[in-house]
Amino acid sequence: MNFNKEKYPTLALAETPESLRLLPKESLPELCSELRSYLLDAVSQSSGHFASGLGVIELTLALHYVYKTPFDHLIWDVGHQAYPHKILTGRRDQIDRIRQKNGLHPFPSREESDYDVLSVGHSSTSISAGLGLAVAAEREGLGRKIICVIGDGAITAGMAFEAMNHAGELHSDMLVILNDNDMSISENVGGLNNRFAQLLSGSFYTRLREKGKKAFSAAPPIKALLKRTEEHLKGMVVPSTLFEELGFNYIGPIDGHHIYTLVHMLENMRHLKGPQLLHVVTKKGKGYTPAEKDPIAWHAVPRFDPLSGTLPKTVDSIPTYSNIFGDWLCDTAATDPRLMAITPAMREGSGMVRFSREYPKQYFDVAIAEQHAVTFAAGLAIGGYKPVVAIYSTFLQRAYDQLIHDVAIQNLPVLFAIDRAGLVGADGQTHQGAFDLSFMRCIPNMVIMAPSDENECRQMLHTGYLHPGPAAVRYPRGQGTGVALQPLFPLTIGKSEIKIQGEKIALLCFGTLLSVAREVAIHLNATLVDMRFIKPLDTELILAMASNHSLLVTIEENVIKGGAGSAVNECLMSHKKTVMLLNIGLPDQFIPQGEQNEMRAAYGLDSRGIQKQIQAYCESEM
């Protein structure tokens, strides 16, 4: 993206944090305006996360202005909001390539920049990593500061509270900034609170507080009285002292869009000892009216016209797999009041908006709490209900112990609707659904299904819902194939379906790559099988294919190691069946960002790539 210095004269002077810190404070408001405008121009041309970044323009500038980054360590939780950070840290001219193949990472990435201290993408990891860095900084003894920025959603997760509890115990020097962009904790924002927060962060109050602790440490009753007095004073104008109980010195809330207040506050807090928490209230989408009015719709956007203020409307007649799932939920709930649908803060992405409105008493958004979501489902199942957990493949990783300990061991009837399985596209390595088959396949009692199209997805959801034990249906991001939807009926568990009868080569396909594999089968005169079930496998069919064909090829959008192909390998070995076998899937590496079909082609999972791998394998065996 060509940077227009005439349009952004102040931003041109702030190419790095070092150059930013040379600017006078009086230039910061104009810099905020230019940075916000530049972000709008860049994302509207390239697509990407948008509303979150608009909401932290002032905070990002203030942090890099006050702290000596990258020597001082700045950590962004999740990273949706880090576009302004990337622009200010030497990546301004590359921002139009963010989330694209060979472009900037969609989130902070250690391999991309020294300013990205922690590679992120999942939520609620910042405080734990920050505390580890704080302990390391103490032992280093160079005066390095640690700052973590976490949102009001991410801070509700158990991991964040575990980290804060430990930080309070260790009493290490670190600053946690709570970016409250939903007004979910407090609405007490204004001049009085800004002034009071400045007083609480100032040197006079801090010295008085610390000296008082030392003076009355030998007199517990007086110390307790003073603590209650301090908490009462704070309680008159700030939220509850939950963070104080965890061992943090709480300051705020303050206006996160007043650059001078932020700079002054951070300058005050830079030298405070022990764990500090600064509560900053921001508005997601700040400065762009459409995004302010609907921050959810403008959270992640395609290319759009910033002047029109509208997002391009999709006119696709083929539904997404997420929508297929959401419609199935509604259809099933209409006949079964025992259905309980659970999501860990992914209502829109999982296609559950309609269900949440039509069946609010059967809908549970448990927030960013994947572990709780799974065990909550276990409790519902024990109580006689039929829980359905809608969860992204990458986020199910966070609840692996609960999947085993609380669901599978007890053989409870919990259905997992696993969205974003396989390659997800622009969100890159932290969000690829590459491992679920591998980590679920080894769990006893699990039934695991992978549909080849949207109709089969519905039938598998229905089958899993009726199954008396744990079941999982994994399906990809994006549209189906356009097939007609049939009335619901249960599939025979563990049975596959031959789609094309060929000779010599048998393609055993697990999931939606079946449509691609069909082209290969026709070209090679190969047998094509829709395997449907990863667990239990259709052992009878696999052995028959091994007897009637000279080469078996497994195809899956999961890592090869431990995946569906590995299951076929194990099956053949256990039955002492010798046949040439080629496993096609994702390699043993983390897959970067890029469009889904673009990345499938890059990793040999399009028709051309699959055929090329088969031909190369056959030639090597000749």
From Swiss-Prot:
Binding site for Mg(2+): D152, N181
InterPro entries: Dxylulose-5-P_synthase, THDP-binding, Transketo_C/PFOR_II, Transketolase-like_Pyr-bd, Transketolase_BS, Transketolase_C, Transketolase_CS
Reactions accelerated catalytically: D-glyceraldehyde 3-phosphate + pyruvate + H(+) = 1-deoxy-D-xylulose 5-phosphate + CO2
Cofactor section: Mg(2+); thiamine diphosphate
Binding residues annotated for thiamine diphosphate, in chain numbering: H80, G121, H122, S123, G153, A154, N181, Y288, E370
Alphabetized UniProt keyword annotations: Isoprene biosynthesis, Magnesium, Metal-binding, Thiamine biosynthesis, Thiamine pyrophosphate, Transferase
Pathway info: Metabolic intermediate biosynthesis; 1-deoxy-D-xylulose 5-phosphate biosynthesis; 1-deoxy-D-xylulose 5-phosphate from D-glyceraldehyde 3-phosphate and pyruvate: step 1/1
EC numbers on record: 2.2.1.7
Any one GO molecular-function label of the UniProt entry: 1-deoxy-D-xylulose-5-phosphate synthase activity
Listed GO biological process terms: 1-deoxy-D-xylulose 5-phosphate biosynthetic process; isopentenyl diphosphate biosynthetic process, methylerythritol 4-phosphate pathway; terpenoid biosynthetic process; thiamine biosynthetic process
UniProt keyword Ubl conjugation present: no
Record text on cofactor binding: Binds 1 Mg(2+) ion per subunit.
An annotated GO cellular component: cytosol
SMART domains in alphabetical order: Transket_pyr (SM00861)
Gene3D superfamilies in the cross-refs: 3.40.50.920, 3.40.50.970
Database matches in HAMAP family: DXP_synth
NCBIfam families xref list: dxs (TIGR00204), PRK05444.2-2 (NF003933)
Function: Catalyzes the acyloin condensation reaction between C atoms 2 and 3 of pyruvate and glyceraldehyde 3-phosphate to yield 1-deoxy-D-xylulose-5-phosphate (DXP).
Family note: Belongs to the transketolase family. DXPS subfamily.
Subunit structure and binding partners: Homodimer.
UniProt-recorded name of the protein: 1-deoxy-D-xylulose-5-phosphate synthase
Gene of this entry: dxs
